[in-house]
């Protein structure tokens, strides 16, 4: 069952839907001097609501970072990811429906010493997680 891999499920969906020119990695961009993107979990509660049957309603915040040599393209791709996920429902391989909503628009973060510019946007992901059956 999908639990801790919500970031992977949502980022893979966005990557395929937009046919991005790079892979969206989890937690970091592996190459320090190349274009890329990553998604990170923002600090958030493990569950918004827990129910007596063991199920729960979960809300997680994800931030997508896009880093590129071309600052304009970095902003554009960050905005495309945001627009694609805003209002989307992503279905995980095990059938979990994840409702996505943009929390922020694409925001400039930094231009590093190598000339790579980073933009980021936050996406809220809500889903109902049924109780586990043993």
Give the ranges of each region predicted by the language model:
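Short, charged interaction patches at domain edges and termini
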Residues: 1-12, 44-57, 96-134
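Helix-adjacent hinge/juxtasegments
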Residues: 55-57, 66-69
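Acidic/histidine-rich, surface-exposed loop or edge segments in extracytoplasmic proteins
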Residues: 60
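Mid-chain, well-packed structural core segment of small domains
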Residues: 67-90
